């Protein structure tokens, strides 16, 4: 049996879209990109979306835009892709790994607040959604609000995750998505985006990208 690694849904008019983009003279950040950012923003219910080349870029730029100090720390799950950790380490931050739940693959929220209380250098929570399982974001954001922490979701596996009003209210928050070939939405092999309702953060990420 031959089971494909992925089988993306390619629209019939893709050739025309590509040709029109090339003929426009805008080979980057053209009208198609702006249109995509607007449509994704409306779909995800975030006020701002920045199209990028990968989810990794989204994680990196979000942390860079916040200008954390070297030696600051971030919470991340023990089970995750290497980018979740390396983006912070590249900027001089240190990870504090949180163990998984006994009945799933996501970080155990029971450990989060204890870690924050013990270490004032923790400035960021990076939850990762995995394999169709979503973190309890309302609970995570409530903890982040209590301690003034930045929440950066690694949603490479969850571009179509359900959103709630609690997220919309909390501006110290961003979400990074992946459009790699085997993800929910693909952009011909590679791609990503960063979503946030914080205009200042979105503007800075656009400048950095």
Model-derived segments and spans:
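Glycine/threonine-rich helix-loop capping motifs at alpha-helix boundaries
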Residues: 200-209
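Structural detector of well-ordered beta-strand residues that form the stable sheet scaffold
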Residues: 50, 75, 96, 151-152, ...
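Aromatic/hydrophobic pocket-lining residues that form π-stacking "cages" and hydrophobic walls in ligand
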Residues: 84, 140, 205
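N-terminal "arm"/small-domain region of PLP-dependent enzymes with the aminotransferase-like
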Residues: 1-27, 31
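Conserved PLP-anchoring active-site segment centered on the Schiff-base-forming lysine
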Residues: 62-117, 126
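Active-site phosphate-binding strand-loop segment of PLP-dependent enzymes
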Residues: 103-187, 193-201
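Phosphate-binding glycine-rich loop
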Residues: 26-73, 87-91, 97-99, 166
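Glycine-/small-residue-rich active-site loops that bind phosphorylated ligands and cofactors
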Residues: 10, 28, 80, 103-104, ...
């Amino acid at each position: 049996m031959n089971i494909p690694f992925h089988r993306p849904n390619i629209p019939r008019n893709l050739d025309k879209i590509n040709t029109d983009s090339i003929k426009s003279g805008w080979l980057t950040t053209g009208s198609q990109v702006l249109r995509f950012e607007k449509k994704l923003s409306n779909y995800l219910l975030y006020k701002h979306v920045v199209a990028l080349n990968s989810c990794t870029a989204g994680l990196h730029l979000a942390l860079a835009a916040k200008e954390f100090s070297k030696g600051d720390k971030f919470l991340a799950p023990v089970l995750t892709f290497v980018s979740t950790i390396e983006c912070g380490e590249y900027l001089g931050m240190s990870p504090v790994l949180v163990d998984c739940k006994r009945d799933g693959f996501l970080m155990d929220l029971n450990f989060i607040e204890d870690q924050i209380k013990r270490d004032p250098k923790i400035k960021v929570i990076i939850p990762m959604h995995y394999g169709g399982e979503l973190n309890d974001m309302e609970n995570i954001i409530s903890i982040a609000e209590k301690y003034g922490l930045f929440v950066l979701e690694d949603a490479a596996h969850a571009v179509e995750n359900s959103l709630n009003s609690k997220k919309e209210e909390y501006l110290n928050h961003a979400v990074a998505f992946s459009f790699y070939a085997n993800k929910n939405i693909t952009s011909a092999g590679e791609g990503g985006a960063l979503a946030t309702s914080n205009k200042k953060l979105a503007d800075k990420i656009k400048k950095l990208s």
